[in-house]
Amino acid sequence: MNKVVVKNVTFGEGAPKICVPMVGKTVAALKEEAEMLQTIDLDVVEWRVDFFEDVKDLAKVEAALDEIRTILPETPILFTFRSAKEGGELAVSDEFYFELNETLAGTGKIDLVDVELFNEEADVLRLIETAHKNNVKVVMSNHDFDKTPAKEEIVSRLTRMEALGADLPKIAVMPKSAGDVLTLLDATNTVSEKANQPIITMSMAGTGVISRLAGEVFGSAMTFGAAKKASAPGQIDVNELRHVLDLLHKQF
């Protein structure tokens, strides 16, 4: 399997990397969050820009990014506009979604960009090309807040993401039972054994919390923890998360 190196973080080896979302609505709130995150043991910061109140002004988005980067100069930043259809805060046109992501990837000031799988393939490929030209890695994602698809479907989506050029394919699904969590873990194990790229998977809510902890066993390269406000159901406090990941890593 290829390793994916972003600044001082290597995906695809050792314990899953911890990503903590920033969900501030204003520049002031984001600066406060970034300063707090400086004090926390994390690997990646995800800027959930769909929470940012000036997201439609691209100059203001870049200015906010500059403020975050000043406070967190060495921390990998994952730039994510989560669409409303995949559980995000704001509904926007497909045109704006791609304009925003291409513009910010084109600055080279972010380290990773989230690209949702279920969009026009030509748009997705163009965004991946822009990202890679600017040394920005692509987390290609899919989120199902209603259910856990069949194992074959989860495997198919992750495999398709890699085929399209994702550096880190990602899927998050909602369990209705413990069996659904096993389905997600089984799919993760199957894909990670044959994939060229590290993958990121999770089963959400309380039922799925084991999937956020067991990535090193089953093959998920990153997990999401909450420092302030969880951006998805089931995210664990980042300090507790690190403790458990370290414990499992020592035994593995």
From Swiss-Prot:
Gene3D superfamilies: Aldolase class I. GO terms for biological process: 3,4-dihydroxybenzoate biosynthetic process; amino acid biosynthetic process; aromatic amino acid family biosynthetic process; chorismate biosynthetic process. It is an enzyme of class 4 (lyase). Pathway: Metabolic intermediate biosynthesis; chorismate biosynthesis; chorismate from D-erythrose 4-phosphate and phosphoenolpyruvate: step 3/7. It holds the Pfam family DHquinase_I. The active site is at residues 143, 170. One of its GO terms (molecular function) is 3-dehydroquinate dehydratase activity. Belongs to the type-I 3-dehydroquinase family. Homodimer. Involved in the third step of the chorismate pathway, which leads to the biosynthesis of aromatic amino acids. Catalyzes the cis-dehydration of 3-dehydroquinate (DHQ) and introduces the first double bond of the aromatic ring to yield 3-dehydroshikimate. This is 3-dehydroquinate dehydratase. It comes from Listeria monocytogenes serotype 4b (strain CLIP80459).
